[in-house]
Amino acid sequence: MPPKAASKGAKKAASKAKAARSTDKKKRRRRRESYSIYIYKVLKQVHPDTGISSKAMSIMNSFVNDIFERIAAEASRLAHYNRRSTITSREIQTAVRLLLPGELAKHAVSEGTKAVTKYTQSK
């Protein structure tokens, strides 16, 4: 007796499995971007003999993302109020002054100005 031909359902399952295998090769893992290397570099500048746990690094990364989003949102709002379509360093500076308290804002503005000056001179 000749072997039975594969049923329709079995053929579909086999073709789905083959399709899944071919897409697995093409699928690349998405890179998770974080500020952890930069946070680590700053930590080593300030306290060379101190380490940081992965949980603490995760918290610091969330903090940096949160502050970044707040500054970006405030700068966007300021640009909108002044009917501007571009966020410039002036909007960022004003947003920082509005968001951060007292002395912290002054230090942030001076460090930001220093960074922008260094960047423009390197070009």
From Swiss-Prot:
Keywords, alphabetical: Chromosome, DNA-binding, Glycoprotein, Isopeptide bond, Nucleosome core, Nucleus, Ubl conjugation
Disordered, as annotated region: 1-32
Positions annotated as glycosylated: S110
Record-listed cross-link Glycyl lysine isopeptide (Lys-Gly) (interchain with G-Cter in ubiquitin), residues: K118
One term of GO molecular function: structural constituent of chromatin
Subcellular compartments: Nucleus; Chromosome
Basic residues compositional bias, start-end: 9-32
Cross-referenced SMART domains: H2B
Post-translational modification comment from the UniProt entry: Monoubiquitination of Lys-118 gives a specific tag for epigenetic transcriptional activation and is also prerequisite for histone H3 'Lys-4' and 'Lys-79' methylation.
Function in brief: Core component of nucleosome. Nucleosomes wrap and compact DNA into chromatin, limiting DNA accessibility to the cellular machineries which require DNA as a template. Histones thereby play a central role in transcription regulation, DNA repair, DNA replication and chromosomal stability. DNA accessibility is regulated via a complex set of post-translational modifications of histones, also called histone code, and nucleosome remodeling.
Subunit structure: The nucleosome is a histone octamer containing two molecules each of H2A, H2B, H3 and H4 assembled in one H3-H4 heterotetramer and two H2A-H2B heterodimers. The octamer wraps approximately 147 bp of DNA.
Protein name: Histone H2B
Organism in which the protein naturally occurs: Urechis caupo (Innkeeper worm)
